[in-house]
C-alpha cells in the first residue's frame, strides 16, 4: 500500500463533516467558555494561566518523545522568559530551557502567518543544545527516513517519509495548501479546527527534520488554531495525547495510508475537547489559588508559605501524596517539631485538611 504522499491527488483530503458536527459544536462551546472567563481575569492571572498551560505542553510534548524534564526547570525558564520573575538560577537542563522557549515563541507569534522560516526557527530553538542534530535545517541524508520499531533483525517499518531531495518542493506545496485552505461547512471555528488537525498530519507525513518532527508538528497544531481564531488558545494538546501515546501513533499511521481522514479528524477533535476541558480546570485552579492567597497570605509564616508554594507549583494534578511532616522538614530544612507545629497551625486555621492518621498522616490544601 502506498503512503498518502505517493498518491497522485495528495493532498486532497476527504472527510465526512456530518461525523464532525457534534464534536465541533462542543469545541465551540468550550472555547467560548474559556474566552469568557479569561476576559474577566487581570493580565497577571492571564499570564498565570498561560504559564500553567505552556508548562503542561512543554513537559508532555517532550515525554511523548521520551524526554523527561522537571516541572521546576521548565517553569522557572517559562516564568523568566515571560517576564513574570526577574531572575532565577540557570537551569541545569538546557533542553528544558529550549522547550520552554519554543512554547513561548509559538504563542508569541500566533497572529503571524505560518512560514518555513518560522518552523526552521522553532527547530533551531529546540535543537540548539543537541550536538548530533543540526537545528534549523531540513534533513539531507540520502538514506530513507523511516519510523521503525523492534530490534535488529526484527525491524518493523511503520512509515517511510518522502526522500530528502524532494522536501523543498513538498514544503512549498504544504505552505501553499495551508494558505489557500477553505472549508466553511462547519463555520469559522470548525474550519480552524479542521485545518489545524490536517496541518499536523500533513507535516508529520513530510517528516522534514532528522529529529523533533513530533514536537514541531504538535506546535503547528496549536499555532494554526490560534492564528485562525485570531487569539492565543490556552490549551495543552500534548497532555491529552500523552495519556494514550499508542492511540496517537496508531491514528497517525492509519491516516498516512489513506486520503479519507474522517477518523483522524474525529480523533484530533476529541483530543482538542479533552484539552479544552483540562484548560477549564486550569482556569478554575488559578482562580482558587488567587483567592487562597488573597485570603491567607498574611496569616502564613515563611516556612508555611514556601511549602504551600511547592504544593501549588504542581498544578492541577496536585502534590502527590499530599504534604507530610517529612516533606515539610525537607522543603524548609527545619526540625520535625517545628514542622508538626506549623502543620497543626494550618489545620487549625482551616488552610490544611488532615488526611489519614499516624505514620500515614498527610495534608491537603483546603480550596473549597
What are the roles of these predicted feature ranges?
Residues 1-368:
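FIC/Doc superfamily catalytic core
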